[in-house]
Curated annotation (Swiss-Prot):
The modification Glutamic acid 1-amide is found at E35. The keyword DNA-binding does not apply. GO terms for cellular component: extracellular region. Keywords: Amidation, Antibiotic, Antimicrobial, Cytolysis, Hemolysis, Neurotoxin, Secreted, Toxin. Has antimicrobial activity against E.coli, E.faecalis, P.aeruginosa, and S.aureus. Expressed by the venom gland. Belongs to the cationic peptide 04 (cupiennin) family. 01 subfamily. GO terms for molecular function: toxin activity. It is found in: Secreted. The lineage of its organism: Eukaryota, Metazoa, Ecdysozoa, Arthropoda, Chelicerata. This is Cupiennin-1c.
């Protein structure tokens, strides 16, 4: 049904956002360490 599709999409988006956030965080930490 529609609910399960929405849940599936929400999970995908959450995973993508988490990946992006992890990348940004790693970059930020690396920049802080090189200062």
């Amino acid at each position: 049904g529609f609910g399960s599709l929405f849940k599936f999409l929400a999970k995908k988006v959450a995973k993508t956002v988490a990946k992006q956030a992890a990348k940004q965080g790693a970059k930020y930490i690396a920049n802080k360490q090189t200062e």
